[in-house]
């Protein structure tokens, strides 16, 4: 019993503990209660630990869960690795990405925060409410990742105060978790969050809108998702009419957008102040997983170098799939030339036989390993372009076809290919328009951990992936549950179908 709780519900870690040893750390309930959650300093530390554990959980899983099972990438070299299994659809129950323990550690941290923050001695009620908003939103986001990866998952909404009395809960269906846990958590966060919180490394009201709209799309409630994005644009401006005082904008200049991916946080001192935007100027990023070893320790260096490559002529774990490479190459073989080719990609070797994603490094640059891990490289969870393309998909499903294409137009304008926008007459069915939007998302958001989730949400996995790696069943949209979790669950969980 103790082992499963240590795996699925491990509690707050002390600073400096490595991610590989978390199952040996005493849970929060074994720390004397009078030493925790008493004042603003304690609460601030607890919230910081939520984000720290989230960084650890997503450091590699960001790529495993959102990218590597899709049609975006192939292996650069045929070496044994988790990504190899994912790309080839050789899913086994010993893969690290099939273990939900690190994600439930974040959830455990949020549960302790939600229970204890109301009783903390914090005179500023707006600040206390914002701390609660962070916890509710991060719990909602973690469960959102969980249901997209495994479908039905166990739900814990209370902290485990005593591991001897802890209950191993069964799995709750995905739709129920979305409807009864994730969306209510995000709505609670929206009601509590301080609108002046603009730091992109933490949850803001803008980020809550993004997660909420995304979750509503997965529930199939497109009207609600459309209304949520309308609230976002009312608060922060639309791509056609940005607000002058908004920190979140659709960046129409691809060079400035590239700079946001590459440079904006390098050398900027952390301020630990959520009302100050460390980026210093409006840009696309809304919520990011901030990788910075000087702030978060050696276990939180960015894996961009390892996965996508370190620059011109250098190796990487993966390169563009032949399918996606052909799409990009076709885009630069015509006039006008798509500017994303030179800003998002580079040749993986001198013969230019294949291409790496190069969004996160300056054009023409080659960066050594040590420099990359010292860079403050962010993994984007949501940026303004997400909002636009999510709403385009929503509009298509609501049969507002021209509105959907108008939104895609903004993205193509920035890419320098405005004239290549499709026309309504090009489509005979709603599904054809949705496929077109998903294709545009694939080109624009390559390397941002979106493609697999887009395929799963729209039930395109078998259609797209069967010719590539043989996926032949909708059940394979889900990941298997790690065998260690099953062994320790005492029969509470059944393996996902097909594994």
Predicted regions and their residues:
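Alpha-helical solenoid repeat scaffolds, predominantly canonical TPR units
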Residues: 109, 113, 185, 228-231, ...
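Elongated scaffold/linker segments in the mid-to-C-terminal portions of large proteins
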Residues: 38-42, 47, 51, 58, ...
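Conserved, well-structured interaction surfaces
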Residues: 39, 44-58, 79-150, 172-180, ...
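Acidic, glycine-rich segments characteristic of secretory precursors and extracytoplasmic regions
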Residues: 20-67, 112, 175, 492-499
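Bacterial Sec-dependent N-terminal signal peptides
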Residues: 1-30
């Amino acid at each position: 019993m103790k082992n499963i709780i240590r795996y699925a519900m491990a509690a707050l870690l002390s600073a400096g503990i490595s991610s590989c040893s978390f199952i040996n750390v005493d849970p929060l309930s074994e720390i004397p209660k009078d030493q925790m959650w008493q004042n603003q300093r304690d609460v601030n530390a607890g919230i910081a630990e939520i984000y720290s554990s989230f960084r650890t959980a997503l450091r590699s899983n960001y790529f495993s869960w959102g990218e590597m099972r899709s049609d975006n990438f192939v292996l650069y070299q045929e070496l044994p690795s988790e990504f190899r299994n994912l790309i080839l659809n050789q899913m086994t129950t010993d893969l690290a990405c099939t273990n939900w323990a690190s994600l439930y550690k974040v959830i455990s941290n949020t549960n302790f925060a939600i229970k204890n923050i109301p009783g903390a001695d914090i005179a500023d009620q707006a600040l206390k409410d914002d701390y609660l908003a962070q916890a509710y939103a991060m719990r909602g986001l973690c469960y959102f990742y969980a249901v997209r990866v495994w479908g039905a998952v166990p739900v814990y909404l209370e902290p485990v105060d005593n591991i001897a009395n802890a209950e191993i809960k069964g799995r709750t269906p995905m739709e129920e978790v979305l409807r009864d846990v994730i969306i209510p958590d995000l709505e609670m966060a929206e009601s509590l969050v301080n609108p002046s919180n603009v730091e992109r490394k933490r949850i803001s009201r803008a980020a809550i809108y993004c997660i909420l709209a995304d979750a509503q799309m997965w529930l199939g409630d497109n009207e609600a998702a459309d209304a949520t994005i309308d609230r976002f644009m009312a608060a922060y401006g639309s791509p056609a009419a940005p607000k002058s005082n908004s920190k979140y904008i659709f960046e129409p200049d691809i060079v400035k957008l590239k700079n946001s991916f590459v440079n904006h946080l390098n050398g900027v001192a952390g301020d630990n102040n959520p009302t100050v935007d460390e980026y210093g100027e409006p840009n696309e990023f809304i919520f990011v997983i901030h990788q910075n070893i000087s702030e978060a320790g050696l276990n939180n260096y960015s894996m961009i170098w390892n996965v996508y490559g370190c620059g011109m002529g250098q190796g990487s774990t993966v390169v563009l799939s032949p399918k996606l490479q052909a799409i990009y190459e076709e885009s630069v073989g015509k006039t006008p030339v798509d500017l994303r080719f030179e800003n998002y990609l580079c040749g993986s070797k001198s013969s230019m036989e294949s291409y790496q994603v190069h969004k996160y490094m300056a054009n023409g640059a080659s960066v050594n390993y040590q420099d990359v891990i010292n860079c403050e490289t962010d993994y984007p969870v949501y940026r303004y372009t997400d909002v636009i393309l999510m709403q385009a998909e929503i509009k298509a499903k609501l049969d507002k076809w021209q509105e959907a294409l108008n939104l895609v137009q903004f993205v193509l304008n920035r890419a320098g290919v405005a004239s290549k926008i499709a026309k309504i007459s090009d489509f005979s069915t709603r599904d054809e328009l949705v496929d077109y939007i998903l294709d545009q998302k694939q080109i624009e958001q390559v390397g941002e951990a979106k493609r697999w989730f887009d395929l799963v949400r729209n039930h395109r996995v078998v259609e797209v992936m069967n010719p590539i790696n043989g996926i032949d069943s909708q059940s394979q949209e889900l990941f298997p549950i790690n065998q260690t979790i099953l062994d320790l669950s005492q029969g509470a969980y059944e393996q996902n179908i097909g594994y």
